[in-house]
Amino acid sequence: MEQLSSANTLFALELFQTLNESSPTGNIFFSPFSISSALAMVILGAKGSTAAQLSKTFHFDSVEDIHSRFQSLNAEVSKRGASHTLKLANRLYGEKTYNFLPEYLASTQKMYGADLAPVDFLHASEDARKEINQWVKGQTEGKIPELLSVGVVDSMTKLVLVNAIYFKGMWEEKFMTEDTTDAPFRLSKKDTKTVKMMYQKKKFPFGYISDLKCKVLEMPYQGGELSMVILLPKDIEDESTGLKKIEKQITLEKLLEWTKRENLEFIDVHVKLPRFKIEESYTLNSNLGRLGVQDLFSSSKADLSGMSGSRDLFISKIVHKSFVEVNEEGTEAAAATGGIATFCMLLPEEEFTVDHPFIFFIRHNPTSNVLFLGRVCSP
């Protein structure tokens, strides 16, 4: 499980960097876990350099028996009985006249719980699009009503892979609504906006990375299996969002080191955190292309013959939509698709005032998997 969670986190950080290049000061929010799961289903049917490029980009080449690892991980992450709701849903929508190999369909069903829904892309692509959107809307409790916009599928579409993830968790320590006030949030050294700032003082795992001048706070959700971890620069020191130094230095090893429970101290923290809601939509072709996935999107080069027995399939688009809402009660989120740090001695009480841009992620603690990763520059 550890190999897979490292692979997923490594991919998460690399994708974050390409999204950051496209939008250096905008909000970012996505589910690396959802994207990795969806592309792992593609690898099941990929051959040759198509498969090799995918394995390398997603770092699956360092994981033994990738598909059964995903099977265990999906079961572990979405097991029933937890005090939060975390739902993973996979489905393949295939052109009904097209012959997919029974072995491929059996494998995606067994490893990813993804069944094939036959639809009529050829004669009724708009109906097929609506059907796919309806299903995703149901799986994400209405938070992602339109995964595929008009024109994304047409009569030439053979296959749409859909992966949706939905999370709703209550804070272990809730914020009281009466403590929420209007407060300024600094977007940069020059600009501010007014936000609804929540407040509480409780004991939380807290750390300070001195060489980065960055505070780390972990806020667990009820049940303790999931946490939100926030990386907050002490101040805005660059001419942009204040996050440039962290974004430059962040690696898999450093992130694990900075945010490990044993490196944080459980102390009283005055937490001020804005309410926020972010919805993002990405077509990931060019981002994945920059990370090394080339052949998959090319009708002449893609080899998905493990899905159909022939070489006429390729993936035209990978669309990922995500949603997160953080308030006094907790968090609702959905998505469809080193150096050792030196920690400082802390005071008995710390201030954690999130009044400028920050990076956050939602982690499944038992497996250390990053389910969602984001940056808030403007809540």
From Swiss-Prot:
<dbReference type="GO" id="GO:0004867">
    <property type="term" value="F:serine-type endopeptidase inhibitor activity"/>
</dbReference>
<keyword id="KW-0963">Cytoplasm</keyword>
<dbReference type="InterPro" id="IPR023795">
    <property type="entry name" value="Serpin_CS"/>
</dbReference>
<dbReference type="GO" id="GO:0019725">
    <property type="term" value="P:cellular homeostasis"/>
</dbReference>
<dbReference type="GO" id="GO:0005576">
    <property type="term" value="C:extracellular region"/>
</dbReference>
<dbReference type="GO" id="GO:0032691">
    <property type="term" value="P:negative regulation of interleukin-1 beta production"/>
</dbReference>
<dbReference type="InterPro" id="IPR023796">
    <property type="entry name" value="Serpin_dom"/>
</dbReference>
<dbReference type="GO" id="GO:0062023">
    <property type="term" value="C:collagen-containing extracellular matrix"/>
</dbReference>
<dbReference type="InterPro" id="IPR036186">
    <property type="entry name" value="Serpin_sf"/>
</dbReference>
<feature type="modified residue" description="Phosphoserine">
    <location>
        <position position="300"/>
    </location>
</feature>
<keyword id="KW-0967">Endosome</keyword>
<dbReference type="GO" id="GO:0042176">
    <property type="term" value="P:regulation of protein catabolic process"/>
</dbReference>
<keyword id="KW-0964">Secreted</keyword>
<keyword id="KW-0646">Protease inhibitor</keyword>
<comment type="subunit">
    <text>Monomer. Interacts (via C-terminus) with CASP1 and CASP4 (via CARD domain); these interactions regulate the activity of inflammatory caspases.</text>
</comment>
<keyword id="KW-0458">Lysosome</keyword>
<dbReference type="GO" id="GO:0044194">
    <property type="term" value="C:cytolytic granule"/>
</dbReference>
<dbReference type="InterPro" id="IPR042178">
    <property type="entry name" value="Serpin_sf_1"/>
</dbReference>
<dbReference type="GO" id="GO:0005769">
    <property type="term" value="C:early endosome"/>
</dbReference>
<comment type="similarity">
    <text>Belongs to the serpin family. Ov-serpin subfamily.</text>
</comment>
<dbReference type="GO" id="GO:0006954">
    <property type="term" value="P:inflammatory response"/>
</dbReference>
<feature type="region of interest" description="CARD-binding motif (CBM)">
    <location>
        <begin position="351"/>
        <end position="379"/>
    </location>
</feature>
<dbReference type="InterPro" id="IPR000215">
    <property type="entry name" value="Serpin_fam"/>
</dbReference>
<dbReference type="GO" id="GO:0044342">
    <property type="term" value="P:type B pancreatic cell proliferation"/>
</dbReference>
<comment type="function">
    <text>Neutrophil serine protease inhibitor that plays an essential role in the regulation of the innate immune response, inflammation and cellular homeostasis. Acts primarily to protect the cell from proteases released in the cytoplasm during stress or infection. These proteases are important in killing microbes but when released from granules, these potent enzymes also destroy host proteins and contribute to mortality. Regulates the activity of the neutrophil proteases elastase, cathepsin G, proteinase-3, chymase, chymotrypsin, and kallikrein-3.</text>
</comment>
<dbReference type="InterPro" id="IPR042185">
    <property type="entry name" value="Serpin_sf_2"/>
</dbReference>
<dbReference type="GO" id="GO:0045088">
    <property type="term" value="P:regulation of innate immune response"/>
</dbReference>
<dbReference type="Pfam" id="PF00079">
    <property type="entry name" value="Serpin"/>
</dbReference>
<keyword id="KW-0597">Phosphoprotein</keyword>
<dbReference type="GO" id="GO:0005615">
    <property type="term" value="C:extracellular space"/>
</dbReference>
<feature type="site" description="Reactive bond">
    <location>
        <begin position="344"/>
        <end position="345"/>
    </location>
</feature>
<protein>
    <recommendedName>
        <fullName>Leukocyte elastase inhibitor A</fullName>
    </recommendedName>
</protein>
<keyword id="KW-0722">Serine protease inhibitor</keyword>
